[in-house]
Design a protein with these regions (language model features):
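Extended, charge-rich alpha-helical interface modules
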Residues: 1-78
């Protein structure tokens, strides 16, 4: 999901509850999206749901990346 080394991710997970919650939320969205994408034909309401899930998933990933950037910046300034 993220292009960070696992030790750094573990460090951030231990120190940032929001990151952990976002990571879990991102996984739930991924599972729900995959379930929708397995269907051959999506009714209009499922198409809307798919787009909503994709946007939420991207927003979660963007926020997680921002947390990682802030954490690295904080580490380098101390």
């Amino acid at each position: 999901m993220l292009n960070e080394d696992s030790e750094w991710l573990d460090h951030v997970r231990k120190g940032n509850r929001e990151f952990v919650e976002l990571e879990q939320h991102h996984r739930r969205l991924e599972r729900e999206l995959n379930t929708l994408l397995k269907r051959r034909i999506l009714p209009a309401d499922d198409e809307v749901r798919k787009k909503t899930l994709q946007k939420e998933k991207l927003a979660a990933k963007d926020r997680m990346n921002e947390i990682l950037r802030q954490s690295k910046l904080a580490e380098t300034t101390h």
